Amino acid sequence: MDWSPSTPSEPGCLPAGCQPLGRNRSANVLEQHLRPWRRSDQRWDLLLLLAATRTAEHPGISAAGATPESRRFTALADAELLLEGPDGPRRWPLPPLPAGVSPALLSHVALDCLPLEPHLAVLGLEHPAPFSHLNLEPQDWGPAACLSTGRAMPPERVAWLWRQGLDLGARFQRPVLLTECVPGGTTTAQAVLTALGISVGNLISGSARQPPQELKRMLVEQGLRRASLPPQPSPLAVLAAVGDPFQAVAAGFLVASRQPVLLGGGSQMAAVLALALAALEPRARQDLSRRALLGTTAWLADEQLGPERQPALGWLLDRVGQHFDVPLCGVASGVRFHDSSSQLLRDYERGYVKEGVGAGALLLLAQLQGQPPQALVEACERAVERLPSSP
C-alpha cells in the first residue's frame, strides 16, 4: 500500500478521536505511556499469540466464527489475513461471521504502514500453521480443555508455557505490541479474573453483538466449583484450572519484560495483566504498570454492559488496578466507520466484532505515527473491496 509521508502526533495530546480509558487519564501519565510509541526513529516488535481452548466449542459462546467447527481455524485464517492481506495466498478460509469482517483486516491495514516486525506463536491449534512461527510447545498438546471442567490444562503444561513466556519477555529488547487470537478467550479471561478475586460482574465483553453473559457466568461458576482452588491461588494454579495457553505465555512475558509493552485487546489483556501482577512483588508491579499500555478500538471502549450502563472496559481496567494497588492506563483508537462506504465496516458501529488480532492497538499506533483516521478508514475500505467474494 502506498502511504503518504506522515508526522508523529504531537506530544502531550492524543491523536484525533482517541480516548483514554478509566480513571488514570492525566496528561502526564498518558504522555509517559505513549512516548515510546510516538518515536519516528523507533522499530518495534509485534508478538501475536494464536491459541485454542475447547471453551470456544460451546454454541453461542463466541462470534469469532459462526459455528463451533469454523472457530477451530479462526486463528489461522486471521493470521494469514494479517500477514498476506485480503487478496494474498490463503490456506484457510475466513470463517463466516454473523456480520462485519474479521478485525485482522483492520490490523493488516495498520501494520502495512508501521515499522513493526511480526512474530507469531501457535499454541494448541488443531491444524498446522502454513506460515513461519515460533514453536513454543508440541503440536499434539492440542487445545486447552473447556474451563468448565476446572482442569483446563495440566500443571506441567502451564509451567512449561509460563517459562516460554519468561524466555520471550527477556529475549525481546525493543518495545513490543503483544496481542492474540483466541476464540472463547473472553470467557477464560472472565474465569481467570474471578479466580484471582477480582469482581468483574458484567464488565467482560466478547465478539458477539450481545455478549452471552449468562452462559459465560454459568461456565465460570462450573469451572471454579470443580477446581476447588484455595483462597488466593497462585497464577499458575488459576491457569491450570480455568485458563488457556495464550494467557500462560503472555503473563510470563509480562513478568520478565523490561521494555514498553502495548497490549492489543480488551478483557483478555486485562486478564493477563492481572496474572502478571499477581506473580510480582509490589515494587515490580509498579514498574510493570509504568511500562504497560492497553490499546483497543473505539467500539470496545464505548461498549456499555450491565445495569450501570458505563463503558465496561474502563471500569474493568480500573478494577484490576485497584485490586493490585497500581494505576493502569489504556487508550482507544480514534478510527470510526459511521460514514464508511462499506457495510461490513459499518457493522462495527452496530456492535459487531468490535476488536481482535490487535486491531485497536495497531490503529492507535498508526495514528501515533501520524496517519489520520480518515486515511485509515479509506484504506480499510479498499482492503474490503479486495476480499474474495466481497459484497
Regions found by a protein language model. Give the residues of each.
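N-terminal loops that bind phosphate or other acidic moieties
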Residues: D2-T179, P183-P391
